[in-house]
Swiss-Prot record:
Function in brief: May function as an inhibitor of Wnt/beta-catenin signaling by indirectly interacting with LRP6 and blocking Wnt3a-dependent LRP6 internalization.
Ranges that cross the membrane: 356-376
Organism, scientific name: Macaca fascicularis (Crab-eating macaque)
Coiled coil stretches, renumbered: none
Protein name as it appears in the record: Trophoblast glycoprotein
Major location (coarse): membrane
Gene that specifies this protein: TPBG
Signal peptide boundaries: 1-34
Cysteine pairings via disulfide bonds: 62-68, 66-77, 298-323, 300-344
Domain LRRCT: 283-346
Residue positions the entry lists as glycosylated: 81, 124, 275
Annotated positions of the Phosphoserine modification: 418
GO cellular component, one term: plasma membrane
Domain notes: The C-terminus of LRR N-terminal cap (LRRNT) and LRR 1 are essential for the inhibition of the Wnt signaling pathway.
Cross-referenced PANTHER family: LP06937P, TROPHOBLAST GLYCOPROTEIN
Length: 420
C-alpha cells in the first residue's frame, strides 16, 4: 500500500495549486470589470451633464420692472413707463396688469408666445396711453375672459382688434367682459373718421364677441349710437352707456338683447324716448334701465313716455326723473305730470315759416344797402346836419328876441307907439 500512500499527497498539492490559480483569475476579472465600469461611468458623466445643461430652464421667471406672484397667478407691471409688452412673461400668469405705462401701439400678436400664455384670463391695459390697437392684437390668448382698455386715447381701433387679423376665418373670441370707458381721443387725433363708427366696427366684425356678457362704454362723448352697434352681441347682460352725450336712441335697436339685465343711460343728453324704443325696452324680460340726470323736455312729445313710466317696472328710480325744459316745467317730477300739463307751442306751417325766413333775408339786405349808402354819403350828410343846426339856432334866437319884447310892457307900448 505504499504506492497509494505516495499518490495521496501529490494529488492534494495539485488541487491546492488549481484552487490558487482560480482565485488569481477571479481577482483579475473582477478588477478588470470594475475598472471598465468606472471608466464607462466616468466617460458618461460629461454627456449627462451636457444633456442637463442643454435643457431650457422652466419659464417661471419674472420680467424686469414687474412684480410676480405664482401663488396668485398674477403679474403686475404698473406705472413702469413700459413702451412694449414684456416678452418673458411667466406661463403661469392668469391676471396681468400693464397699467400706467407708455405703450402707444399694440401691434398684431402683442401677446403671442411659444408656448402660448394659455392661462391668461384677465388683462388690464388701462391708462397706458395707447392710441392704436391693431388687428389681431389679442390673438393666441385662448383663455382671455376680461379685457380693460379704459382711459386710453384710442385714435385707431382696428375692426379686427378683438376678432383676429382675419375675421372671416378666426374663431370666436373668448372674451366675456370688455371695458372701454373713456377711450375717446382728442379732436386733433380723430383722423377724420367717426369715433362712434370706429368703435361699432370693432364690436361687430366677424361676430367674434357673441359670447360677451359685459360691455362698458361710459364717458366717451358719444353723440349717437350706430344702427348695428349691438346687433352682434346677443349674449350681452350688462351695458353701460352712462356719461355720454346721447341725444336720442331712435336708430339703435335693443330687440335682440334678450339676456340684457342692466342698461345704464345716466348722465346723457336724452330729451325723450319715443314709442319704438319704449316698446323694445318693455319687450326685454329681465332688463333694468337707469335714466337719471338727463335733460327731459316736458312738452307734448313727452306724453307717451310719461304714460309708459307710470305703467312699467323696467325703469329704476323713475320717481327721481324730473323735467329740465321748458322753464315753466323745470324740476317737475315726470310721474306727476298729466296730459294737460304737456303742451307744445303752436307750430307755424312750413310755407309760412319759409315766407318769414325770406322776409327776414330781404329786410337784412335792405338794411345793409341803407347802411352802405349812409357810409358813402357821410360827408354830405355831415354838412347837411350842420346846416340844419345853424338854421335851428337862428330860428331859436329870433324866437327868444320876440319873447323878450312881448314880456316887457314898456317895450310893448313903445312898439305900439312906433306903429302909430
Amino acid at each position: 500500500m505504499p504506492g497509494g500512500c505516495s499518490r495521496g499527497p501529490a494529488a492534494g498539492d495539485g488541487r491546492l495549486r488549481l484552487a490558487r490559480l482560480a482565485l488569481v483569475l477571479l481577482g483579475w476579472v473582477s478588477s478588470s470589470s470594475s475598472t471598465s465600469s468606472a471608466s464607462s461611468s466616468s466617460s458618461s458623466a460629461p454627456f449627462l451633464a451636457s444633456a442637463a445643461s442643454a435643457q431650457p430652464p422652466l419659464p417661471d421667471q419674472c420680467p424686469a420692472l414687474c412684480e410676480c406672484s405664482e401663488a396668485a397667478r398674477t403679474v403686475k407691471c404698473v406705472n413702469r413707463n413700459l413702451t412694449e409688452v414684456p416678452t418673458d412673461l411667466p406661463l403661469y400668469v392668469r391676471n396681468l396688469f400693464l397699467t400706467g405705462n407708455q405703450l402707444a401701439v399694440l401691434p398684431a400678436g402683442a401677446f403671442a408666445r411659444r408656448p402660448p400664455l394659455a392661462e391668461l384670463a384677465a388683462l388690464n391695459l388701462s391708462g397706458s396711453r395707447l392710441d392704436e390697437v391693431r388687428g389681431g392684437a389679442f390673438e393666441h390668448l385662448p383663455s382671455l375672459r376680461q379685457l380693460d382698455l379704459s382711459h386710453n386715447p384710442l385714435a385707431y381701433l382696428s375692426p379686427f382688434a378683438f376678432s383676429g387679423s382675419n375675421a372671416s376665418i378666426s374663431a370666436p373670441s373668448p372674451l366675456v367682459e370688455l371695458i372701454l370707458n373713456h377711450i375717446v381721443p382728442p379732436d386733433d387725433k380723430r383722423q377724420n373718421r367717426s369715433f362712434e363708427g370706429m368703435v361699432a366696427a370693432a364690436l361687430v366684425a366677424g361676430r367674434a364677441l357673441q359670447g360677451l356678457h359685459l360691455l362698458e362704454l361710459a364717458s366717451n362723448h358719444f353723440l349717437y349710437l350706430p344702427r348695428d352697434v349691438l346687433a352682434q352681441l346677443p349674449s350681452l347682460r350688462y351695458l353701460d352707456l352712462s356719461n355720454n352725450s346721447l341725444v336720442s336712441l331712435t336708430y339703435v335697436s335693443f330687440r335682440n338683447l334678450t339676456h340684457l339685465e342692466s342698461l345704464h343711460l345716466e348722465d346723457n343728453a336724452l330729451k325723450v324716448l319715443h314709442n319704438g324704443t319704449l316698446a323694445e325696452l318693455q319687450g326685454l324680460p329681465h332688463v333694468r334701465v337707469f335714466l337719471d340726470n338727463n335733460p327731459w323736455v316736458c312738452d307734448c312729445h313727452m306724453a307717451d313716455m310719461v304714460t309708459w313710466l307710470k305703467q312699467t317696472g323696467v325703469v329704476q328710480g323713475k320717481d327721481r326723473l324730473t323735467c329740465a325744459f321748458p322753464e315753466k316745467m323745470r324740476n317737475r317730477v315726470l310721474l306727476e305730470l298729466n296730459s294737460a300739463d304737456l303742451d307744445c307751442d303752436p307750430i307755424l306751417p312750413p310755407s309760412l315759416q319759409t315766407s318769414y325766413v325770406f322776409l327776414g333775408i330781404v329786410l337784412a339786405l335792405i338794411g345793409a344797402i341803407f347802411l352802405l349808402v349812409l357810409y358813402l354819403n357821410r360827408k354830405g350828410i355831415k354838412k347837411w346836419m350842420h346846416n340844419i343846426r345853424d338854421a335851428c339856432r337862428d330860428h331859436m334866437e329870433g324866437y327868444h328876441y320876440r319873447y323878450e319884447i312881448n314880456a316887457d310892457p314898456r317895450l310893448t307900448n313903445l312898439s305900439s307907439n312906433s306903429d302909430v
